[in-house]
Amino acid sequence: MIVGLIGKIIKKEPTQLNVNVNGVIYEVFVSLNCSSKIVSDDVKLEITHIIREDAQSLYGFLDSNEKKLFDTVIKINGVGPKVALAICSTFTPTSFAQIVSSNDVSMLKRVPGIGPKGASRILVELSGFIIDSNDETSGSSSALEAALALESLGFKKDLVSSVLKTCVNSNTSDLVKEALKKLQK
């Protein structure tokens, strides 16, 4: 599996790059957001390598949160790489997380290839989608552990994620205690 590429861009289109890595040229599909952030010919991309019976495709990302969004969305039944890339092109990971948390079907229907049923399915499947912030890596892992603990106690994902956003503690056990107090009200 190819998980990353470092090389020079020899051809750039809005959603596709040809990247020369030590004499081997790779075709990499990128979102419009990713493409607009590329200012130099030298590029370092995180890659999702998808192997199908009839093709192998590389999808590149400058941002690990965008890669996480893509990887999460393509796991949903009925959503392929093209629609996942369209989601990444239409929304930043942060704005997508806000759309999911607010259950905004109309915003999600703006993505080419997503209708009302598809938008509803995506929102149901991804309730509780959280992106990692670069400066709070340990805090986000504690929040994830706390969320899993609370869900195992029977609380719903969307309720848990909304309560955890209001919590101020940083370690897992304190987060769980604080969230339980808020959930009991």
Swiss-Prot record:
This is Holliday junction branch migration complex subunit RuvA. NCBIfam families: ruvA (TIGR00084). GO terms for biological process: DNA recombination; DNA repair. HAMAP family: DNA_HJ_migration_RuvA. Keywords: Cytoplasm, DNA damage, DNA recombination, DNA repair, DNA-binding. Residues 1-62 are annotated as: Domain I. Pfam families: HHH_5, RuvA_C, RuvA_N. InterPro entries: DNA_helicase_Holl-junc_RuvA_I, Hlx-hairpin-Hlx_DNA-bd_motif, NA-bd_OB-fold, RuvA, RuvA_2-like, RuvA_C. Residues 134-137 are annotated as: Flexible linker. Residues 138-185 are annotated as: Domain III. Homotetramer. Forms an RuvA(8)-RuvB(12)-Holliday junction (HJ) complex. HJ DNA is sandwiched between 2 RuvA tetramers; dsDNA enters through RuvA and exits via RuvB. An RuvB hexamer assembles on each DNA strand where it exits the tetramer. Each RuvB hexamer is contacted by two RuvA subunits (via domain III) on 2 adjacent RuvB subunits; this complex drives branch migration. In the full resolvosome a probable DNA-RuvA(4)-RuvB(12)-RuvC(2) complex forms which resolves the HJ. It comes from Aliarcobacter butzleri (strain RM4018) (Arcobacter butzleri). Belongs to the RuvA family.
